[in-house]
Regions:
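Bacterial N-terminal signal peptides that target proteins for export
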Residues: 3-17
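Immediate flanking context of iron-sulfur cluster ligation sites
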Residues: 72-88
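Signal peptide processing junction and immediate N-terminal pro/mature segment
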Residues: 28-44
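C-terminal cap of thioredoxin/glutaredoxin-like
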Residues: 162-167, 173-186, 197, 243-325
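Structural alpha/beta surface segment adjacent to cysteine/selenocysteine redox centers
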Residues: 81, 88, 94-119, 169-170, ...
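N-terminal "domain-start" segment that seeds a small globular fold
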Residues: 54-62, 137-154
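A short beta-strand-turn-helix
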Residues: 74, 146-161, 186
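Bacterial N-terminal signal peptides
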Residues: 18-28
Length: 325
């Protein structure tokens, strides 16, 4: 360890001399002319015009349509859609051109309202364009043949549109969709026949016996009562709960337990699962309007369902084509 001691006289003199020379150099430097300041760097470019402004201006002047309620970012995304996407009626114009130059085209207005709802929900323009393209392409795609027991349907059997939902009783998204779909079906009972098909997913172990319980209740005349009870108890669908729910809706839980143990409805449920697989179901809930897959990425709201119903009705009324404006 180094120890602290007195500095020797000769060494002290050398230190003082070095300090004196250093101070002399510094004094000379301070007396010399200061170097000219560096030229200022290039000025920063002015901030780019916010996308919102260009979006808002692009949406102005469209006859009969007002998008001022949309946020600036949503207006920008919608403006991009209008400039990049073509009208689904088949005319050689973008949506924006069709709205301003072909004002009689009702298709462009409907398509724009659909895009505006997506933009308002925060969906970027690229995703909106993909969703719109897939939605309108679905009308020309081959329809799926879906055979559902009429006891699993509600509404007029002669309704022009049949809406089939494939759902999993443990699926949280299906649970959220249930009240929306049922309200829509009841509101449009003469226009829509709504059918539900159990489609248990592999990751939901209790969805399989729950689906069998629904089919069993159907044979007792209470499919929809069991359907609703299952969704309301989706977090606890053990066999004991299924028996409890059967008793609660006025059926004999002991009989349901026997049916589950015997696998009475396993084969029929497998048939519905196979039907969904053939229809290329990618998840639940999956909706089909007259056999046409209606992707829920556009939203599963009563407004969107009404939009799809109107489109399906228009398509059918024009012999499976879009009317030319």
């Amino acid at each position: 360890m180094a120890k602290t001691g007195a500095v020797l006289p000769a060494r002290r003199n050398r230190v003082l001399l070095a300090l004196t020379l250093a101070l002399t150099v510094l004094a000379g430097a301070s007396s010399s002319e200061a170097a000219p300041p560096s030229p200022p760097g290039p000025s920063k470019p002015a901030p780019a015009t916010p996308p919102a402004a260009s979006g808002a201006s692009a949406l102005q002047g469209i006859p009969g349509m007002d998008f001022s309620a949309l946020s600036p970012s949503a207006q920008h995304e919608l403006a991009t859609v209008l400039s990049d996407e073509f009208c689904y009626c088949g005319c050689p114009h973008t949506l924006g051109q069709c709205l301003t130059g072909h004002t009689g085209c009702q298709h462009a207005r409907r398509m724009t309202r659909l895009a505006a709802r997506q933009a308002a929900a925060g969906v970027p323009a690229t995703d909106i364009i993909v969703a719109l393209s897939e939605y309108y392409a679905s009308f020309r795609a081959p329809r799926q043949k879906l055979e559902v027991d009429p006891r699993m349907c509600m509404g007029d059997a002669k309704a022009p549109v049949t809406l089939v939902e494939f759902s999993d009783f443990e699926c949280p998204y299906c649970g959220k969709a249930r009240p929306v779909l049922e309200a829509f079906a009841k509101k449009n009972a003469t226009k829509v026949r709504f059918c539900n098909v159990p489609y248990p997913l592999p990751m939901h172990p209790n969805a399989l016996p729950a689906g069998q319980a629904a089919l069993w209740a159907r044979d007792q005349g209470k499919y929809w009562e069991m359907h609703d009870a299952l969704f309301e108890n989706a977090h606890r669908l053990s066999t004991a709960t299924l028996v409890e729910l059967a008793n609660k809706i006025g059926l004999k839980g002991a009989e349901l337990q026997k049916a589950l143990q015997a696998g009475t409805y396993a084969q029929e449920l497998e048939k519905y699962k196979s039907m969904g697989t053939r229809a290329n179901i990618r998840g639940t809930p999956s909706l089909f309007f007259n056999g046409r897959f209606n992707d829920v990425q556009l939203g599963l709201t009563e407004e969107m369902l009404s939009h799809a119903l109107e489109d399906e009705t228009t398509w059918r009324a024009n012999n499976n084509a879009w009317a030319a404006d």
